[in-house]
Amino acid sequence: MNRKKKWFSLLPMVLMLVFVLSFPAGAADWPDTIVDGHLHYLDFLQQSDGFFKLTRKMDECGVDSAVIFGMAMAKQWDENTETAPTYYLSNDSRCYYYSGTDHLLLQALRKQPESIKKRFYPFICGINPNDRYAASQLRNLLEMYPGEIYGIGEIMSRHDDLTALTYGEPPHADHPAFLEIFDLAAEYDIPVLIHHNISGVNIEDPIYLKEMQNALAHNRDADIIWAHVGISRRITVPTLLQVADKMLKENSNLYYDISWIVFEDYINKDEKSLKDWAKLIEKYPDRFILGTDKVGHWDTYPQEVTKYTPLIKLLSDDTAAKLTGGNMLRLIGVQENAAVKPVKKAS
């Protein structure tokens, strides 16, 4: 057999290998459509590995598309610090709200070929949530980039160390500026993704829950996605599962994003926790969203997808399909395999 014939005889095996490697581990348990519902294109230095590398990593683990946004804060490099910070926790220099992040994202996406561009649904986030002008600034962006923006977020409310390092007063979800953002989102029929710690560091009672309850009650037409089920580093609320159940029952406009450490620290903490959270997701199948929460760099992107496989295995096919893409696509007004742009509600 000559080399050419030998190559063609191996081609089916090669194609099969490529097909298998393009899906998450345990792919037989995963739905056909996977949407990353929480992804930062930029890090705290407003830098990124770029779209080309990102899409290659998405292909490695079978992710079809992603909701993507910049980073609302930037880390300051102080004059008396010789080593440049690479993360907001690199040192004790301050952070500040950075409005350029949305333009960096949207302009970078505009430059991509259609094959890449069509896989991303941009959100906007570059505002100071304590500023009563914030909603007006977001409206300007919605008008500046018509048909290109699918939501608002990730907007930072209470966020432990990040809140402490950021210039200005601590934000909270029921601040008047936040309430006006929710009104804007309802007007445009787009969701808001918000990071709001449910409690303080090492405080077991959910002391900041009331602020989110007020936010949700302010405008029931505003769909609010609560990032990480309100959890961050060193946030230890033993009753989180029960609180989440009650909140979903009482607030029809609430959705939970299970990205980042809430999955490791709570949902997949042990076998019992995983089963209990799977039951809650089955109870409210339309209200949970999967995401990676990667921040500008993609080397470990596939692992942040495949970590959900144990949970996916416990869910019904219909619920799994909603968690891994259906719920987010519905919230942003997109049907699977379609490019429907969000439209402003008639006034």
Task: For each feature predicted by the language model, list its residue ranges.
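Bacterial N-terminal signal peptides that target proteins for export
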Residues: N2-M13
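N-terminal carbohydrate-binding/catalytic regions of secreted carbohydrate-active enzymes
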Residues: L39-Q112
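Catalytic pocket-lining loop regions of alpha/beta-barrel enzymes
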Residues: P113, H159, T166-I289
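Hydrophobic faces of well-ordered beta-strands that scaffold small-molecule active sites
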Residues: V35-L39, A66-I68, F120-I124, G151-E154, ...
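Mid-to-C-terminal alpha-helical segments outside catalytic/metal-binding sites
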Residues: K4, G26-G37, Q46, G50-F69, ...
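Acidic-and-aromatic substrate-binding clefts and catalytic sites of carbohydrate-active enzymes
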Residues: L42-G50, M73-W77, C95-T101, I127-A135, ...
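Active-site gating/metal-coordination segments in enzymes
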Residues: E82-S199
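Bacterial N-terminal signal peptides
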Residues: L11-S22
